């Protein structure tokens, strides 16, 4: 990709038209002009009175390297010869009020390590990728009809060195990737890696959208990390925040002394919940900045997906007492998704949206926002509220566990057990569970069993896989020493077996987005808090029966209606002794009894374990048996309507 000479740029291409390669115009680019090697600096500052480039090379003297205004709308540019890579710099901006302010480059691809805030000249074009095989394999499979397990993590607190310092991108490739492969996760989702000044913002309050944070190394180091992930078959999803940004003095806020990237109207500019300001998504230059940024991460870092943060905050104005939709944001999100899928039709665009906004994952040509996945926040909130309730009272909120099936096919959903639910006093997943020590582990195993058998792709935050007891501490690493304790080892073994079972069981993912893939057996047993259902694959014989018991009671000879196969085997029981359970399992092959039950033509009698999930698989189809009514009903699949764009 060549750097475009700013003096040749038609102003309409950036100021009034869709222009998604703005990173080729703006920023600091190492070039040769008039046979001299140096750096061309270009920036947009529409209300600046004067602009300069400052750095160690001119002792930060803003009188030395004055920039030239090349468009009336405020593009400034300057070529400085003999500057080399790794020079640090900022823009000195004389405002209309006569003040001089110093700003980092909005398009810088590298920055100083915090607490320093200058931008760094860096040639990002030289990395040699080795992931062609990954790209080919990705195109051969449709994620909609495949298993998808996402490991969400915070790069700075997954694991730290003995002296408390951070692992680099390259070191994390050596530490993290084998762990992810061992657990059979298909993707990792990393909390924001854009440059940000404050560690405890977790990256959600950025200053450098084009700069991979230097906390962990150079852009090439991050490219190496992604390359290694692809080598081992792991997709990489990044958290991305196009809705708001931080107010630190060196960043985008009041960039030229006036609202530039943010709304001018204070009522909609400020975001009081986070202490940030909202991007002006109605401004063409801002849209080009953000959409170019998304494509930049795709093209230069080979990212496989974005989890778009705080979509609800974008969709609605945050004026007090108002629920009015923000049409700027709606049209921006549609434009963003159209641009992303034009670049890569296999990309993952996931909306973190807690509202009931319709058609989030429908294509824009059907009136949708154009994402292909959405976090199921409703499922997460309902299920965790149910699990935190004392078991004897769960029967009174039975609908918390069934309500999601009324809407689960309205969108393409990911089920998130995310970082938001294990921080700020909310407790870890394990510690949310009521009861004594044994009860907590049993119920977490039960929760995971329900999680992996409910329709929708899966996402788990780091530490959940071995039952982290304390909630997430963002300045510390995970409690890896918990592996010294037997119950945590049992939990870890159970989770690995459960995820392996999920991946090899087509009924648990093949029809995730089709009503054909799920059928209740009994959704109404609130008195015993027992739920049973069928997960179905493309073929009739690809079926699993799932029974979940959310109380501590054990039931012998419990009748469960099942599709008419001759035998069933129990392929997983969360109460097995090897997982730390009491051993109430069904070891023998279960022969079906030819008596109707639960609206099925046959049933089996099983032992229901305390706080347990039991998964049954048919062994042999009864000769001459008829297909169960409703087991393969013809319903328009969301995969067809939302999968292709």
Curated annotation (Swiss-Prot):
Keyword Transferase included in the entry's annotation: yes
For this protein, what reaction is catalysed? Transfers a segment of a (1->4)-alpha-D-glucan chain to a primary hydroxy group in a similar glucan chain
Annotated GO molecular function terms are: 1,4-alpha-glucan branching enzyme activity; cation binding; hydrolase activity, hydrolyzing O-glycosyl compounds
Ranges annotated as biased composition (Polar residues)? 636-645
SUPFAM superfamilies the record matches: (Trans)glycosidases (SSF51445), Glycosyl hydrolase domain (SSF51011)
Gene Ontology cellular-component terms for this entry are: cytosol
Pathway per its UniProt entry is: Glycan biosynthesis; glycogen biosynthesis
Which Enzyme Commission number(s) are on file for it? 2.4.1.18
Residues at the active site: 309 (nucleophile), 352 (proton donor)
Region of interest called Disordered, as start-end residue ranges on this chain: 619-645
Q: Which GO terms describe its biological process?
A: glycogen biosynthetic process
List the keywords (alphabetical).
Carbohydrate metabolism, Glycogen biosynthesis, Glycogen metabolism, Glycosyltransferase, Transferase
Q: Which InterPro entries match?
A: A-amylase/branching_C, Branching_enzy, GlgB, GlgB_N_E_set_prok, Glyco_hydro_13_cat_dom, Glyco_hydro_13_N, Glyco_hydro_b, Glycoside_hydrolase_SF
Sorted alphabetically, which Pfam families does this protein's record hold? Answer: Alpha-amylase, Alpha-amylase_C, CBM_48
Q: Tell me the subunit arrangement.
A: Monomer.
The text of the family note is: Belongs to the glycosyl hydrolase 13 family. GlgB subfamily.
Q: What does the UniProt function comment say about this protein? A: Catalyzes the formation of the alpha-1,6-glucosidic linkages in glycogen by scission of a 1,4-alpha-linked oligosaccharide from growing alpha-1,4-glucan chains and the subsequent attachment of the oligosaccharide to the alpha-1,6 position.
Annotated protein name in UniProt: 1,4-alpha-glucan branching enzyme GlgB
Q: Which organism is it from?
A: Bacillus cereus (strain 03BB102)
């Amino acid at each position: 990709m060549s750097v475009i000479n700013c003096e040749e740029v038609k102003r309409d291409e950036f100021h009034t038209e869709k222009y998604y390669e703005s990173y080729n115009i703006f920023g600091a680019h190492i070039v040769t002009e008039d046979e001299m090697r140096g750096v061309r600096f270009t920036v947009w500052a529409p209300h600046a009175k004067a602009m300069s480039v400052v750095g160690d090379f001119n002792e930060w003297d803003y009188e030395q390297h004055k920039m030239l205004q090349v468009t009336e709308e405020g593009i400034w540019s300057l070529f400085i010869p003999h500057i080399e890579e790794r020079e640090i710099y900022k823009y000195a901006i004389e405002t209309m009020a006569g003040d001089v302010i110093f700003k980092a480059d909005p398009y810088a691809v590298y920055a100083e390590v915090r607490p320093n805030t200058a931008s760094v000249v860096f040639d990002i074009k030289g990395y040699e990728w080795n992931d062609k095989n990954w790209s080919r394999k990705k195109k051969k499979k449709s994620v909609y009809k495949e298993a998808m397990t996402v490991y969400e993590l915070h790069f700075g607190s997954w694991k730290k060195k003995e002296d408390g310092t951070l692992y680099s991108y390259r070191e994390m490739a050596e530490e993290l990737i084998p762990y992810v492969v061992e657990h059979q996760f298909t993707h990792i989702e990393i909390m924001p890696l854009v440059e940000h000044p404050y560690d405890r913002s977790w990256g959600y309050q950025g200053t450098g959208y084009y700069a991979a944070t230097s906390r962990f190394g150079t852009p090439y180091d991050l490219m190496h990390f992604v390359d290694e992930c692809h080598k081992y078959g792991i997709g990489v999803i990044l958290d991305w925040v196009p809705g708001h940004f931080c107010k630190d003095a060196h960043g985008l806020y009041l960039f030229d002394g006036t609202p530039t990237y943010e709304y001018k109207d204070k009522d909609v500019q400020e975001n009081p919940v986070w202490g940030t300001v909202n991007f002006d998504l109605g401004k063409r230059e801002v849209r080009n900045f953000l959409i170019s940024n998304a494509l930049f991460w795709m093209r230069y870092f080979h990212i496989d997906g974005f989890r778009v943060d705080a979509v609800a905050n974008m969709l609605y104005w945050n004026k007090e007492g108002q629920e009015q939709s923000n049409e700027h944001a709606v049209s921006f999100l549609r434009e963003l998704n159209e641009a992303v899928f034009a670049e890569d039709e296999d990309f993952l665009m996931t909306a973190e949206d807690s509202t009931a906004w319709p058609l989030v994952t429908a294509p824009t040509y059907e009136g949708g926002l154009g994402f292909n996945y959405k976090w199921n926040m409703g499922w997460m909130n309902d299920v965790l509220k149910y699990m935190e309730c004392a078991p004897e009272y769960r029967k009174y909120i039975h609908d918390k566990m069934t309500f999601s099936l009324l809407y689960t096919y309205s969108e393409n959903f990911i089920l998130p057990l995310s970082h938001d639910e294990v921080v700020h006093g909310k407790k870890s997943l394990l510690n949310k569970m009521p009861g004594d020590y044994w009860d907590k582990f049993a119920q977490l195993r039960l929760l995971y069993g329900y999680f992996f058998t409910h329709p929708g792709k899966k996402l788990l935050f780091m530490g959940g896989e071995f039952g982290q007891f304390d909630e997430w501490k963002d300045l510390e690493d995970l409690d890896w020493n918990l592996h010294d304790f037997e119950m945590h080892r049992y939990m870890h073994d159970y989770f690995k077996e459960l995820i392996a079972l999920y991946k090899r069981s087509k009924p648990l993912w093949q029809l995730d987005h089709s009503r054909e893939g799920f059928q209740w057996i009994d959704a109404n047993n609130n008195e015993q808090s027992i739920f049973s259902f069928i997960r179905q694959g493309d073929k009739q014989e690809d079926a699993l029966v799932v029974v979940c018991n959310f109380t501590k009671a054990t039931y012998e000879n419990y009748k469960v209606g099942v599709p008419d196969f001759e035998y069933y085997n129990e392929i997983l029981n969360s109460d097995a002794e090897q997982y730390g359970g009491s051993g109430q399992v069904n070891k023998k092959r279960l022969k079906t009894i030819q008596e109707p039950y639960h609206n099925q033509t046959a049933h089996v009698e099983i032992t229901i374990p305390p706080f347990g999930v039991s998964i049954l698989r048919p062994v042999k189809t009864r000769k001459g048996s008829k297909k169960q009514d409703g087991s393969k009903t013809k319903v328009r699949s969301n995969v067809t309507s939302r999968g292709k764009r």
